[in-house]
C-alpha cells in the first residue's frame, strides 16, 4: 500500500526487458515512489519512545510550523501548555527544537533564534498516543509513540519527520517506506 502507479511505471521502465535473472533492490522502487509523493505529502511529527520535556524560559506558547517546505499547504498550528514530547534518544543534550528554540540539556530555553549548529529535532506539543505499523520481512513491528494532532483523512500519505512516509489509518499509521 502507498506505492503510486506512476512509481511502478517508472520502476518497470527503468528495469527494462531482459532475459537475465536479476535482483532489483526495493530501494529503487521506493526512490521512484518518493519522487511521486514528496510534493503532495504533508509533514507530521511522530515521536517514538516519547519522553516529556518541560521547557523553562520564554518560549512562544502558540505558533505554526510549515506543512511542506515547497508548497502552499496550510501550516501546522500548535499550542504549548505544559511542555513538549521528544524522542528519548534526543533527551539530555543541547538541541534545537525545530522552528521553535534552542534548549540546553535540561530544557532551559537559550535562544529563540538558531544560535549554533546543534542538532535540530522534531517535537510534539500535546499530541495523541498512536501506533506506527512497520512491515519488516514477514513480521509486523508496532512502534508506539505520540502523533502530532492533525485533521488528515484516513488514506492520506504523510511524511513523518525523521522517519519516512506513512498512510494515515483509523487507528494509527502504516509505514510505506523511509
Question: PLM features: residue spans?
Answer:
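Catalytic adenosine-cofactor/nucleotide-binding cores of aminoacyl-tRNA synthetases and other
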Residues: 1-178
Amino acid at each position: 500500500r502507498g506505492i503510486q502507479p506512476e512509481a511502478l511505471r517508472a520502476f518497470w521502465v527503468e528495469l527494462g526487458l531482459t532475459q537475465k535473472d536479476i535482483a532489483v533492490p526495493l530501494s529503487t522502487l521506493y526512490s521512484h515512489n518518493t519522487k511521486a509523493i514528496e510534493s503532495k505529502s504533508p509533514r507530521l511529527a511522530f515521536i517514538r519512545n516519547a519522553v516529556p520535556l518541560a521547557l523553562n524560559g520564554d518560549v512562544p506558547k502558540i505558533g505554526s510550523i510549515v506543512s511542506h517546505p515547497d508548497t502552499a499547504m496550510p501550516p501546522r498550528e500548535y499550542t504549548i501548555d505544559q511542555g513538549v514530547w521528544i524522542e528519548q534518544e534526543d533527551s539530555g543534550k543541547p538541541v534545537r527544537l525545530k522552528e521553535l528554540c534552542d534548549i540546553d540539556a535540561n530544557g532551559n530555553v537559550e535562544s529563540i533564534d538558531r544560535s549554533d549548529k546543534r542538532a535540530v529535532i522534531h517535537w510534539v506539543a500535546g499530541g495523541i498516543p498512536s501506533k506506527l505499523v512497520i512491515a519488516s520481512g514477514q513480521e509486523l513491528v508496532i512502534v508506539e509513540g505520540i502523533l502530532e494532532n492533525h485533521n488528515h483523512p484516513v488514506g492520506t500519505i504523510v511524511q513523518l519527520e525523521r522517519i519516512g512516509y506513512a498512510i494515515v489509518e483509523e487507528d494509527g499509521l502504516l509505514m510505506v517506506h523511509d
